[in-house]
Amino acid sequence: MKRLIYTLCLIIGCATLSEAKVLTGHKTRLTDNWLYLRGDIGNIWEAVRPAAPGSSECVPLWTPVTLPHCFNATDAVDPDMNYYQGPGWYKTLLDIQNPYPNGRILLDFEGAGQKTEVYIYTTRVASHIGGYDEWT
């Protein structure tokens, strides 16, 4: 009897799994349209405040980059100078269109190094400490 119940549960479970619709997500690589600042900012508002490019309010100056990007790729290999070990900031604008009711968007970082903090506008939403590991 136990074997029959187990077999029925297994059949029902397999039938349920075979009919389940798995919604696969859409992946978009966010490699373009990034800005980078070598150095620190006073607070997160300085990274998100609107300022026209080239205006006097666009200070500190942000440099356009494509990811992956290493902010000390040149000075780290020069034996005659100390390489930069300070903070660096990256920012971009994302147009998020979630097609699923009550769905969610996941940001998967393929590699963010050492100490990373992620902000959406001015709210810190995630952090990571470690090597260039992948994390979500």
PLM feature spans:
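Accessory beta-strand-rich segments of carbohydrate-active enzymes
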Residues: 26-30, 35-41, 85-136
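Hydrophobic h-region of N-terminal signal peptides that target proteins for export
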Residues: 9-18
